[in-house]
């Protein structure tokens, strides 16, 4: 089983770009969403087109419903129908309960939870056959709660619940799964020391290899019983 009509949000950089590389191949069509990483999106497009992949790029701010609607319209016009949606994009800003703002709260909830829900709804209306997948990139913070990154963690906890409830709702024609990575790629605001401390606090005491996340995505797509 393969995915051939793929949408990846936040697909121009980091984990999203790695997933795009993993799922690319001759005659496959991938729509890569980006927001501020236009040059990286264009470079990735050129790279993947050399493998015979058809790449479509679309810009959008996922905290704005008008942009989400634009992305859906563009996806329908290019792909015609869908068989894989990877909700990878996320907003990641640090705040706590005692200093969060309604603006930050709203942007996190809209970007990290409302948009995956809206895209999942539209995905379900534009599929063919029974081998269709939605894969949500969550976060290990959902299972190891801390008071840090408050708005982000709340939004990802909601995405975890969305994953479980949409799996029930969309079965059997759409399988919905989530991946909750541990420390994978150092955030640009992190020091090397802080990042190392973060992954050493995990049971395996190692940084996650992004290729392992990509392999998990591929496994979900190819295994019709999950």
Label for each model-derived stretch:
Residues 209-226:
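C-terminal substrate-recognition "lid" of short-chain dehydrogenase/reductases
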């Amino acid at each position: 089983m393969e995915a051939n009509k793929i949408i990846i949000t936040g697909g121009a950089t980091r984990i999203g770009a790695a997933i795009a590389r993993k799922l690319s191949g001759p005659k496959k069509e991938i729509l890569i969403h980006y927001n501020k990483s236009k040059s990286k999106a264009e470079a990735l497009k050129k790279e993947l087109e050399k493998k015979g992949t058809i790449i479509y790029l679309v810009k959008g701010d996922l905290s704005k419903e008008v942009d989400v609607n634009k992305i859906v319209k563009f996806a329908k016009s290019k792909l015609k129908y869908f068989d894989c949606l990877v909700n990878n994009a996320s907003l990641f800003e640090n705040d706590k309960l005692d200093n969060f703002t309604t603006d930050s709260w709203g942007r996190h909830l809209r970007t990290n939870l409302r948009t995956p829900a809206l895209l999942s709804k539209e995905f379900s209306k534009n599929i063919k056959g029974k081998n269709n997948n939605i894969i949500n990139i969550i976060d290990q913070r959902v299972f190891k709660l801390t008071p840090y990154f408050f708005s982000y963690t709340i939004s990802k906890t909601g995405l975890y619940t969305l994953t479980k409830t949409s799996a029930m709702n969309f079965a059997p024609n759409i399988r919905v799964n989530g991946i909750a990575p541990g420390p994978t790629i150092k955030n640009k605001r992190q020091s090397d020391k802080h990042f190392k401390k973060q992954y050493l606090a995990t049971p395996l005491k190692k940084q996650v290899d992004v290729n392992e996340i990509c392999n998990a995505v591929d496994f979900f797509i190819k295994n019709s019983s999950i």
